[in-house]
């Protein structure tokens, strides 16, 4: 396993990137077998926008509505249920902070096919931009490492983000990738139909026709 020593050691050393841009880059690297769980808020909205294509919307995405902090637990459950499938959790810093216990659970389980991507803008943007703990000194990647997730790293910039996603697709995890992002509004808004989101995702995982 290659070292992560060349990546930033703290949040302040990472470049501030655009959420939609890096989400689009990640989705573009995926095939049709990886599952992606989008947490609530603008992270979710940009995943929705980035996953549309002339061939239709990506069925292997699940868009969480209304409940904070559940992208990582849901992704862990999918990864356990389908260990042959790479599973990604996309979550904002505020939601991760709400469910910090999930990180130690992921570390204890050591699920090899799981990657967590944290979009960290230091704010609860969708509710008015109130500062999160990461905006006041907390380092979510440092917290993840202390929780037992050794393969945790800040993406220094867009190229480093692509490199880390590529490694997570090829190497065993669990992985956690921290991304400092800007406060730009999302490109689109996720559809508000929970049953349709569920059914499409289940078809994408091959558990429903």
Q: How should these model regions be labeled?
A:
Residues 35-40, 63-64, 89, 153-156, ...:
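General beta-strand structural signal in soluble alpha/beta enzymes
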Residues 3-68:
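Active-site diphosphate/adenylate-binding microenvironment
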Residues 40-43, 121-123, 180-186:
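Glycine-rich beta-alpha junction loops
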Residues 1-23, 28, 32, 171-209:
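Glycine/aspartate-rich loop-and-adjacent alpha/beta segment that forms the canonical ThDP
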Residues 2-10, 131-167:
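Conserved thiamine diphosphate
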